[in-house]
Amino acid sequence: MTERRIIHIDMDYFFAQVEMRDNPKLKGKPVIVGGKASSRGVVSTASYEARKYGVHSAMPMSQAHKLCPNGYFVTSNFGAYRETSAQIMSIFRSYTDKVEPMSLDEAYLDITELVRPDLPASKIAQYIRKDILEQTHLTASAGVSYNKFLAKLASGMNKPDGLTVIDYQNVHDILMTLDIGDFPGVGKASKKVMHDNGIFNGRDLYEKTEFELIRLFGKRGRGLYNKARGIDHSEVKSSRVRKSVGTERTFATDVNDDEEILRKVWELSGKTAERLNKLQKSAKTVTVKIKTYQFETLSKQMSLRDSVSSEEDIYNIAYLLYNDLKDPDVPIRLIGVTVGNLEQSTNKNMTIYDFI
């Protein structure tokens, strides 16, 4: 049986990172997302600069203001977070259909079928993080292991912008020395019960019998017994069927030079073709999306008589669509190429004259 390979990706201080990306003046500042300092709400996310003051998620905004009076308090912009999350999830699904989102900024990926001797899971995780950085200008931390529990644990070990692998060689040492509060799923209430019963780290948990843990925690006790041993048989659950494949890029500065933009369209067409080839699919629709310097999103789609899968075919159509969309007086900050209506590949090469 092939050993499973699971990646857990967790974006670093996601909401705050998006705010700092979209407003560069906030970069490096103690950013606190959730609302005004005087509001009755709670903190959604705090940047690492704000966390140095003791600010953390779910803290009342009033308390955050007392701890960090010079912080930059920002109202949540869920539209921007959802849009960025959709980009990130699209990146995940360009690698595998086995994706289980846990929230806007977190997901499990089962990449077992992608791993080869020359392409270990850690390398795939590096590629995914690189794609996220290039396409969204945000950093992510990744954990790689042979089950979901250990992958999630690993993703939190070297934040921010970290990559950690837990394998059979190091799992025991990591779990035995792990503070009990750092076990995924152990909250404040559980931690207190643990401490009251002499459980302060993984070794203490490991030394408890399954019966003792069930007595203390009910059905959860069996799961805790297994976690202390690095055991987790749960599957990555994905009910989504892939309907499209695409790639986007945000330019470092706003651009209105056709030559530069079309070079990027060629690059995106190539990446999209690679992913179609990996899936052994071809597409009957091509879409080009642009986002202007004013953050207005425009898109244009073409439906095709015959499906396409090559870099050249996708570029030829994307070229036509871009020319329909462009306004030479309006710089753009993002461009994307997406193909949809997927079917099994026929590998028929076409020319631009088939589409006009």
UniProtKB/Swiss-Prot annotation:
Q: Which residues form the active site?
A: E106
Q: Does the keyword Nucleotide-binding apply?
A: no
Site feature (Substrate discrimination) residues: F15
Question: Highest taxon of the source?
Answer: Bacteria
* EC numbers for this chain: 2.7.7.7
Which EC class heads this enzyme's classification?
transferase
Give the cofactor note: Binds 2 magnesium ions per subunit.
Localization per Swiss-Prot or TrEMBL: Cytoplasm
| Main subcellular location | cytoplasm
The yes or no answer to whether the keyword Transmembrane helix is present is no
Q: Spell out where the chain crosses the membrane.
A: none
Alphabetically list the UniProt keywords.
Answer: Cytoplasm, DNA damage, DNA repair, DNA replication, DNA-binding, DNA-directed DNA polymerase, Magnesium, Metal-binding, Mutator protein, Nucleotidyltransferase, Transferase
Gene Ontology annotations of biological process type: DNA-templated DNA replication; error-prone translesion synthesis; SOS response
UmuC domain: residues covered: 6-187
Positions of Mg(2+) binding: D10, D105
Fetch the Pfam families from UniProt. IMS, IMS_C
Q: What does UniProt give as GO cellular component?
A: cytosol
Q: Name one GO molecular function term.
A: damaged DNA binding
Cofactor(s) of this protein: Mg(2+)
Catalytic reaction annotation? DNA(n) + a 2'-deoxyribonucleoside 5'-triphosphate = DNA(n+1) + diphosphate
Q: Which family does it belong to?
A: Belongs to the DNA polymerase type-Y family.
**Subunit composition and interactions:** Monomer.
**Role noted for this protein:** Poorly processive, error-prone DNA polymerase involved in untargeted mutagenesis. Copies undamaged DNA at stalled replication forks, which arise in vivo from mismatched or misaligned primer ends. These misaligned primers can be extended by PolIV. Exhibits no 3'-5' exonuclease (proofreading) activity. May be involved in translesional synthesis, in conjunction with the beta clamp from PolIII.
Stated name of the protein: DNA polymerase IV
Q: Which organism is it from?
A: Staphylococcus aureus (strain JH9)
Q: Which gene encodes it?
A: dinB
